[in-house]
Swiss-Prot record:
Subunit structure: Homodimer.
Keywords carried by this UniProt record: Cytoplasm, DNA-binding
Xref: SUPFAM superfamilies: YbaB-like
An MF annotation (GO) of this entry: DNA binding
Descriptive protein name: Nucleoid-associated protein Noc_2594
GO cellular component: bacterial nucleoid; cytosol
Keyword Cytoplasm found: yes
The organism of origin for this protein: Nitrosococcus oceani (strain ATCC 19707 / BCRC 17464 / JCM 30415 / NCIMB 11848 / C-107)
Length: 106
């Protein structure tokens, strides 16, 4: 029984180390959200910081509300990409280490 507990503790420590490394990688990653067929693009980090907003020059002749809607849509697209990549990264880190049917709230 003692060996099993020691093995479980090693797995938990390895999981913690892997999770910390994954969180750092995710924080440093950048995704690009787009809207309007690429007319608006947002570069966002894994920490949801907006690094860059690019608006195609043709849009400046359009109405203000449409540009605002496209910026919001591009931000939402970037947020969804960060969430998807975070979930994929974390689930790959924990696969095989958790009991069957147990999921982390990611």
């Amino acid at each position: 029984m003692k060996g099993g507990l020691g093995n479980l503790m090693k797995q938990a420590q390895q999981l913690q180390s892997n999770m910390e490394k994954a969180q750092e990688e995710l924080a440093n990653m950048e995704v690009t959200g787009q809207a309007g067929g690429g007319m608006v693009s947002i570069v966002m980090t894994g920490r949801y910081d907006c690094r860059r907003i690019s608006i195609h020059s043709e849009l400046w002749q359009e109405d203000k509300e449409m540009v605002e809607d496209l910026v919001a849509a591009a931000i939402n697209d970037a947020v969804r990409q960060v969430e998807t990549q975070s979930k994929e990264k974390m689930s790959s880190m924990t696969s095989g280490m958790l009991p069957p049917g147990f999921k982390l709230p990611l």
